[in-house]
């Protein structure tokens, strides 16, 4: 585009940019001046150019003062008169205070300590504390429709401001726009603090001599498109809450580190060119200078040291990274004209929204800008930031928001309340001090975006890899050394950033080629030297960043697509490492000498160090100073080795430098020609004497200027090499006993300090002895090499006989160097060969074939327990899981079993041996018949008084005291009632102790079943200590008290959450006070507040003695034994049985009333049946009487039947009366018999109580007789009735 949006690339523009920035700063500092005065001054300076060129744009035909008023009213056309008064009132208030930048009320709010941020997802306001390093967020309540309806108002921000300048000055050109853009780039907050009119005044002041170029008005369609694009980018910035640290740290998300990106002429996102010579005017998007670190101090930023470490590498790769990531930056996808137009319109658009937004809650500004640049109030901001964390979490939970940002909050542990927000989609935990991530992150199943960059993480929990919807994961700037193998379980992952870590290798088991959704992979600035073969087959990657590693990739290859980079690595073949012939020729050294590795260089240094040690001992120097120097130099040696390997991208560079040192050592008398260039790490040390060397060089050649500090000094002789490397690599004398002293005296011949004849003779003798020793060592090494060659030949012959392929043999670098340097005058000292110790046979090995395995009796977190027999002894065999068994695990297992089998204690399960075969590893222990304490406690049929339970807990404490008293300490790691076994004499023995190797190897499996017994610090993955066993012992005490399962009815996550919150198991009201106090002490959250097992023993012993005393007193006084348990199960409420006789008596007493009731009911039924039968007989007799009466009434009846029937009736009535009397007598007899039986039972009970003798058989006899006596009258009655019926 043309007009004011064009960019002027002339030198005059670059010179004006620095002046403009200074003028803008001065304008912002003196912004309290009146608006009309600034513009009037400009108009007075330009009286000759009034309103000549802007009649078409602004229709302003007034004089200078009226023009200023018109521009002011047009700039504030969207606001009311009341708003203008408020703005002017606030500006006046700002002028009364100290050097506070004046701002509108819609932007400042500096009087309030806490600002309000507008939520991006809803209209609710969120109070958020601001950290001093956070940038302001521009959240404006302007809808897209409002932007489209107010296009006429938006246009004047770009055009009217510049046109007013044309009307007043007639000199608004490209340089003006350039100044506007520079002002926007200098500080994002200055855009907010300055108004449209102050911008025009600065342009008028800075551009008096520029060319006259009139700006044409933009078309509404073009402006509408540009505004829509700017609005979308600004909404994206608001949604992601970009911070100033993003550009400083260089995490690669919204932008890269500008210290890397900036070149001598680099085009920024606003379209202007930054010069490499102007450090103060070159700024990034966040508003901070590139080469200045004034915004962030070392104390405020824990990551600044990391950026400084990589500064040299970043400078080398600056241009390269600019070219490589050109396709990923949004700004570089646009043309230059579009960038220029966007920058100009962006300034006007922001200014328009400054006037439109009057609510303080919509805009927030960092407070550190208003502290005069001296950092005042930063400590208060840090406190507010810590206080702000729970407020953010609570606000997100209340609003049901899907995004939570806790970045730059100095968190060491993630708050547990975060895991309760299950609706989270976006979680930002960057720029904290996190070392571990809780396993509860697996609860956030809806999480899509997770940022953990700029922390101290070394590993991730396995629950994180089960998140099904995670698409973006940032892990850059941490301490990862390997790529997690479980990362391929994140099937939805699209972006993965592992840059700026310490990754040295990517395992083939990672299977990154199977992650088809992964399109962006960032592995910058690690220590990768190769990639797995299956990763090279990945064809789904669209972005692959590999710069800053040790891969053989140059800039041209890194610019290519990921597929081309991977194809190049597939066909790459590493060349043979050779010494650079050019460097050797410059140093006048024999080019046939091969390079040496790190170990050989250190060996050379150690020889010099040993020689210096001997000379210092002869001089009897202070040993304390010597030890301090030893420690310092040992650290410097490690630093030398690490930094040389890390700083050099090529692996051969360090070897070349080491080779130069060796060559200088082997040829001390070489003529001084071109000097040797050594790394700066060797030479930037003030105590090494390099300054003296420089002084000598200056004395010899005064006209030659000394090199700067950044360049490495040079060494012209062997004495400086000796002094420098011996000072740095001074090692312990114990490590150098076998090393012979080095011929340092050869280098001392050239120095004027050693010219005595005696010293020369001593030196010659020492040289002869050293040469003899070295010759002997060479002979021994030659013999060893011959033996090795013979062994290799024998192995090759065996392989040829067996038909196996031959493997090429790789010689050691040290041996190669020694063999090739045999002909040289001064042989190279070497490191003594390591003696390989022959592994001793395992003493406690139990072959699996000798064990007869029976039924399974249990199952644990890392094995199954079987009952078995070994050599006639009943044993328990624990078969370990062999999922990932390797040789190291078997070796560690043997060491631990060797230690455990030597333990002997009555409260410890006896280890008898182990089978260490990789196919079936197992442990053999003694077998205890009663089983585990957990099964005994859950069996209600087994009665256990309080004294027995106290004794069981005391036995457990004794066993744990013994384990913790061993050296080294044996930590159980899984103490619970399932691992406490009971023998026949009710003695507890601790089982499954030790085996840290197996338990740590299967920690996840163990945690699944024993979460309720695990200490809080173990759940937080802070490691096991002996106090973790004390916490588990508290849960065991609770089980002994209640005989219940802890945390019954809760799943694992609920238990973990309750333990993290500090919740503990409920304490019953009937618990003894001393016992409850001990439990509360043992399950304290702070491990330091928990007692040790030696402290627990006397407490348990005191409670046992008190219970025994109470028990004896209660027995002597005839009272029941003291009971501790639920009141409903108290046996004292019931009469306890004394012996078997009383139990039988009680059973009979309960059975007899029931039998009597049944007999009475039967008698009543029988009597009713008899009465009914008699009534029927009476009715029949009445019928017969009626018939007889009828016969008597008739005279013709010849028989006297009436009298016969009357006699029979009388007889029948008599029999009936007799029967009734007999029935009554039987009832009376039964009652008497029952009374007699009751009397007999009472007498027997009294006799049993007095004598205690068992009941004789008389009870059964009487009982049978009573039953028979009841049955006989019934049979007699039935017989009598049958006789009567027969008679009838």
Curated annotation (Swiss-Prot):
GO terms for biological process: defense response to Gram-negative bacterium; negative regulation of cell motility; negative regulation of phagocytosis; protein modification process; response to folic acid; signal transduction. Residues 13-79, 156-220, 1257-1268 have a biased composition (Low complexity). GO terms for molecular function: ATP binding; protein serine kinase activity; protein serine/threonine kinase activity. LRR repeats lie at residues 400-421, 423-444, 446-468, 469-490, 492-513, 517-538, 540-561. Residues 302-343 have a biased composition (Basic and acidic residues). It is an enzyme of class 2 (transferase). GO terms for cellular component: cytoplasm; cytosol; nucleus. CDD domains: STKc_MAP3K-like. PANTHER family: MITOGEN-ACTIVATED PROTEIN KINASE KINASE KINASE 20, SERINE/THREONINE-PROTEIN KINASE TNNI3K-RELATED. Belongs to the protein kinase superfamily. TKL Ser/Thr protein kinase family. This is Probable serine/threonine-protein kinase drkD.
């Amino acid at each position: 585009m043309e007009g004011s949006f064009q960019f002027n690339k002339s030198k005059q523009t670059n010179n004006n940019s620095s002046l403009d920035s200074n003028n803008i700063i001065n304008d912002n500092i003196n912004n309290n001046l009146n608006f009309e005065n600034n513009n009037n001054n400009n108009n007075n300076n330009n009286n000759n150019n009034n309103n000549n060129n802007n009649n078409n744009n602004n229709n302003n035909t007034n004089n200078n003062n009226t023009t200023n008023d018109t521009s002011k009213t047009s700039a504030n056309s969207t606001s009311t008169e009341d708003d203008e008064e408020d703005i002017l009132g606030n500006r006046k208030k700002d002028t009364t205070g100290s050097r506070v930048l004046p701002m509108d009320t819609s932007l400042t709010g500096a009087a309030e300590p806490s600002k309000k941020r507008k939520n991006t997802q809803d209209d609710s306001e969120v109070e958020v504390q601001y950290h001093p390093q956070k940038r302001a967020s521009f959240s404006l309540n302007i809808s897209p429709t409002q932007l489209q309806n107010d296009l006429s108002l938006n246009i004047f921000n770009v055009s009217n401001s510049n046109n007013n300048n044309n009307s007043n000055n007639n000199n608004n050109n490209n340089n003006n726009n350039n100044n506007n853009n520079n002002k926007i780039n200098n500080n994002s907050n200055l855009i907010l603090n300055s108004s449209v009119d102050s911008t025009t005044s600065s342009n008028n002041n800075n551009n008096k001599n520029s060319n006259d170029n009139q700006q044409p008005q933009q078309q509404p369609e073009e402006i509408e498109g540009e505004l829509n694009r700017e609005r979308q980018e600004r909404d994206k910035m608001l949604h992601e809450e970009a911070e100033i640290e993003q550009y400083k740290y260089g995490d690669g998300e919204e932008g890269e580190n500008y210290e890397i990106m900036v070149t001598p002429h680099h085009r920024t996102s606003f379209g202007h060119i930054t010069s490499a010579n102007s450090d103060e005017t070159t700024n990034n998007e966040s508003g901070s200078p590139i080469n200045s670190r004034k915004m962030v101090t070392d104390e405020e930023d824990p990551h600044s040291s990391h950026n400084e470490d990589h500064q040299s590498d970043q400078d080398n790769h600056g241009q390269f990274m600019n070219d490589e990531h050109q396709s990923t930056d949004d700004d570089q996808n646009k043309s230059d004209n579009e960038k220029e137009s966007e920058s100009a319109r962006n300034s006007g658009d922001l200014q328009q929204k400054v006037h439109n937004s009057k609510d303080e809650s919509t805009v927030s500004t960092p407070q550190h800008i208003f502290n005069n640049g001296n950092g005042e109030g930063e400590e208060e901001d840090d406190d507010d930031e810590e206080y702000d964390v729970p407020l953010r979490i609570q606000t997100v939970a209340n609003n049901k928001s899907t995004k939570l940002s806790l970045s730059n909050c100095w968190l060491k542990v993630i708050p547990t309340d975060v895991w309760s927000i299950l609706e989270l989609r976006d979680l930002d935990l960057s720029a904290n001090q996190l070392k571990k991530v809780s396993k509860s992150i697996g609860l956030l199943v809806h999480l899509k975006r997770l940022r953990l960059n700029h922390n101290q993480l070394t590993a991730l929990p396995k629950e994180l890899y089960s998140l099904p919807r995670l698409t973006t994961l940032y892990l850059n700037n941490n301490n990862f050394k390997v790529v997690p193998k479980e990362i391929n379980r994140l099937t939805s992952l699209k972006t993965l950033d592992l840059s700026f870590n310490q990754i040295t290798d990517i395992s083939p088991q990672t299977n990154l080629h199977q992650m088809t959704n992964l399109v962006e992979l960032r592995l910058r600035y690690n220590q990768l030297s190769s990639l797995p073969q299956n990763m090279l087959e990945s064809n789904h990657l669209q972005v692959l960043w590999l710069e800053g590693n040790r891969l053989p990739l140059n800039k041209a290859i890194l610019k290519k697509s990921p597929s081309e980079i991977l194809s190049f690595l597939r066909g790459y073949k590493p060349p043979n490492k050779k010494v650079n012939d050019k460097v050797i020729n410059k140093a006048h050294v024999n080019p046939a000498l091969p390079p040496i590795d790190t170990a050989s260089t250190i060996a050379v240094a150690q020889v010099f160090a040993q020689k210096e040690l001997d000379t210092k001992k002869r001089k009897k120097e202070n040993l304390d100073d010597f030890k301090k120097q030893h420690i310092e130099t040992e650290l410097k040696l490690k630093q030398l080795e690490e930094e040389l390997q890390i700083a050099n991208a090529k692996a051969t560079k360090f070897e070349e430098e080491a080779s130069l040192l060796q060559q200088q050592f082997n040829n001390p008398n070489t003529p001084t020609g071109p000097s040797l260039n050594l790394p700066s790490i060797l030479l930037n040390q003030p105590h090494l004497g390099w300054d003296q060397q420089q002084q000598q060089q200056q004395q010899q050649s005064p006209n030659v200027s000394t090199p700067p500090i950044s360049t490495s000094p040079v060494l012209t002789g062997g004495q400086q090499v000796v002094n420098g490397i011996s000072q740095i690599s001074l090692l312990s004398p114990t490590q150098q006993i076998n090393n012979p002293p080095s011929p340092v005296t050869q280098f001392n011949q050239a120095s004027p300090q050693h010219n005595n004849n005696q010293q020369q003779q001593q030196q010659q003798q020492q040289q002869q002895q050293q040469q003899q020793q070295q010759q002997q060592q060479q002979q021994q090494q030659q013999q060893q090499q011959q033996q090795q060659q013979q062994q290799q030949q024998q192995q090759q012959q065996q392989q040829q006989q067996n038909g196996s392929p031959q493997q090429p043999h790789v010689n050691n670098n040290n041996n190669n160097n020694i063999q090739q340097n045999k002909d040289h005058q001064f042989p190279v000292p070497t490191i003594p060969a390591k003696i390989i110790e022959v592994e001793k046979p395992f003493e406690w090995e139990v072959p699996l074939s000798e064990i007869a395995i029976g039924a399974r009796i249990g199952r644990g977190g890392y094995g199954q327990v079987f009952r078995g027999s070994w050599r006639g002894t009943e044993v328990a065999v624990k078969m370990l899981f062999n999922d990932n068994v390797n040789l190291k695990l078997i070796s560690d297992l043997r060491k631990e079993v060797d230690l455990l089998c030597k333990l002997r204690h009555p409260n410890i399960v006896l280890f008898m041996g182990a089978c260490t075969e990789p196919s079936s590893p197992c442990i053999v222990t003694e077998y205890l018949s009663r089983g585990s304490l957990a099964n005994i406690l859950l069996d209600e049929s087994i009665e256990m008084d309080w004294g027995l339970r106290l004794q069981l807990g005391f036995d457990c404490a004794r066993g744990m005291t013994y384990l913790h008293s061993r050296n080294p300490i044996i930590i159980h790691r899984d103490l619970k009632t399932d691992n406490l076994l009971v023998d026949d004499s009710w003695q507890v023995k601790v089982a499954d102790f030790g085996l840290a190797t197996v338990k740590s190897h299967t920690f996840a499996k163990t945690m699944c079943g024993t979460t309720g017994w695990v200490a809080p610090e173990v759940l937080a993955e802070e490691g096991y200590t002996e106090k973790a066993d004390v916490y588990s012992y508290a849960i065991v005490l609770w089980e002994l008290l209640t005989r219940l399962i802890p945390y019954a009815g809760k799943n694992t996550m609920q238990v973990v959450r309750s333990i993290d919150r500090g919740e503990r198991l409920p304490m019953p009201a009937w618990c003894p006070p001393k016992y409850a106090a001990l439990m509360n002490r043992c399950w304290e959250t702070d491990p330091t507040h928990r007692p040790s097992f030696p402290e627990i023993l006397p407490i348990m012993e005191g409670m046992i003695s008190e219970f025994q005393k109470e028990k004896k007193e209660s027995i002597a006084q005839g009272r029941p034994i003291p009971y501790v348990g639920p009141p409903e199960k108290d046996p004292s409420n019931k009469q306890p049985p004394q012996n078997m006789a009383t139990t039988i008596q009680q059973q009979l007493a309960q059975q007899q009333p029931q039998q009597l009731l049944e007999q009475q009911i039967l008698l009543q039924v029988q009597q009713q049946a008899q009465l009914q039968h008699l009534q029927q007989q009476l009715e029949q007799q009445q019928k017969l009487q009626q018939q007889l009466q009828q016969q008597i009434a008739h005279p013709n009846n010849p028989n006297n039947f009436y009298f016969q029937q009357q006699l029979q009736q009388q007889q029948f009535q008599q029999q009936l009366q007799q029967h009734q009397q007999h029935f009554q007598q039987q009832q009376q007899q039964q009652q008497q018999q029952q009374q007699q039986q009751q009397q007999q039972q009472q007498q027997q009970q009294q006799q049993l109580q007095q004598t205690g003798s068992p009941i004789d058989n008389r009870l059964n006899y009487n009982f049978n007789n009573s039953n028979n006596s009841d049955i006989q009258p019934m049979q007699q009655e039935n017989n009598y009735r049958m006789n009567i019926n027969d008679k009838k």
